[in-house]
């Protein structure tokens, strides 16, 4: 990511950037590198506790200029467009990055502390504009048809937006989740050590 000059597009099912990751995203923003991240929403993840680690950083990611998208199980089921990029449950599984429209990373590594320090992960970088173009096409379809776009409102609160045809729907709570799941994650979050998520 440090070598990016114009754009970076990342998919990661589990995203916990930590302070160093936030610094890297902020540096991209300061260099006017367009950064897009697609990850799982709370409704889509199979690890709600890991999602608490990610949710700590959403505001900072948005403030640093990241275009942030979260996969929606309901929107995915309706469009049936995630295909090999995810699962039939409307969950992101791909771990990819495209830098400047030609360098592609595909691997098993999430952007989280476990992948960095505890798990054995691997990945490959390929310089292929054709592969990058196809991967970007799939990501663009996914983010437009199968994901919520996140933003901050005028008071700095999170909003999730979905576009269906000509209609924009705005959610102020994590979409497709119950009050109880959100409460559980909010209460347990302060006690979860980030390096174990």
Residue ranges and their predicted role:
Residues 9-12:
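Short catalytic-loop micro-motif centered on adjacent basic/acidic residues
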Residues 1-7, 193:
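Secondary-structure "cap/kink" motif recognition
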Residues 15-197:
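PLD/PLD-like phosphodiesterase catalytic module centered on the HKD motif
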């Amino acid at each position: 990511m440090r070598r990016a000059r114009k754009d970076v597009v990342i998919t990661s099912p589990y995203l916990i950037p930590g302070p160093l990751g936030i610094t890297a995203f902020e540096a991209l923003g300061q260099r006017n590198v367009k950064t897009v991240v697609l990850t799982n929403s709370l409704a889509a993840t199979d690890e709600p506790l890991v999602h608490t680690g990610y949710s700590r950083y959403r505001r900072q990611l948005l403030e640093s200029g990241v275009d942030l998208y979260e996969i929606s199980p309901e929107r995915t089921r309706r469009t049936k467009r995630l295909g090999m990029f995810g699962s039939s449950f409307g969950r992101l599984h791909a771990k990819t990055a495209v830098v400047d429209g030609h360098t592609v990373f595909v691997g098993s590594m999430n952007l989280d502390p476990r992948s960095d320090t505890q798990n054995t992960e691997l990945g490959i970088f390929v310089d292929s504009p054709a592969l990058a173009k196809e991967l970007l096409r799939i990501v663009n379809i996914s983010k437009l048809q199968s994901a919520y776009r996140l933003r901050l409102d005028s008071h700095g609160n999170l909003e999730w937006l979905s576009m269906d045809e000509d209609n924009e729907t705005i959610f102020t709570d994590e979409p497709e989740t119950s009050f109880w799941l959100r409460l559980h994650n909010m209460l347990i979050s302060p006690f979860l050590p980030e390096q174990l998520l």
